[in-house]
Amino acid sequence: MKAGKVKAIGVCNFLPDRLLDLILSHEIVPAVNQIELHPFCQQKELRKLMAQYQIQPMAWAPFAEGQNGIFQNPTLTAIGQEYGKTPAQVVLRWLMQSNMIAIPKSVHEERICQNFDISDFTLSISDMEQIEHMDTGKSLILDVPALDEVQRLHGIRFVQ
């Protein structure tokens, strides 16, 4: 970056300790950190640190890969019914209103179109608070600090 050849970097799965170490040790502030982020895993501590350094959170698996019954969740369903929207659309709108980038996955054309159809409603403060209360404070998909998870992500088979 100092040579001017790189204008910005992004990182993935950098937890608070790793992110702060990168910033303080290398004087590099990433533009984005792609992390597991959905109503059940809101990464509040990490997002607070990211906000201090103006790092944009990018939510991979914004639908928690379908876990915890997210598409049938009573809170998300009730909020969606108020606006004529699906639970998935409520999640995407929550992310948008929280200034988080969402990268939802779908292979179904109808759902892809629905994912874009979130600009015609705004979640109320009460709606946002209800979603905030869904946070479990832990990952559902990846245990990023676990050594076997790190090896798996690098294609290395963990042997005991």
Where in this protein do the model-derived segments appear?
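Beta/alpha (TIM)-barrel catalytic core signal, keyed to glycine-rich beta->alpha loops juxtaposed to Asp/Glu
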Residues: 1-160
